[in-house]
């Protein structure tokens, strides 16, 4: 599915076949207009082909609030960061990187709570069931 198509577009870019990557991603995105993976792959391909205006339009289509990175739009935030780096907008790139870093810290906290449990698990340190 989408993962395989995303990888194919990345391989095309890595091989320097930017126009082919753009064409592939364009067709994929046109078939799946709501698919953020298709859109993100397309943004990366457009950046590789230096088609910055089209890349920016796609980014704004999927990122409405640049201060809110969520699980659903994280990959587009990463593409947007790369886009702003490519066009030399250091301020905007730094802003998005900060939001991404905050999101990563949030995810790390969630994982930590899930794996280690929170302090509110009902056990006092001195009354653990395995002591």
Model-predicted segments: where are they?
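Structural register within alpha-helical repeat arrays
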Residues: 8, 42, 79-83
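Structural motif corresponding to the intra-repeat A-B loop/turn of tetratricopeptide repeats
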Residues: 15, 49, 86-87
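Canonical positions in the second alpha-helix
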Residues: 27-28, 62, 66, 100
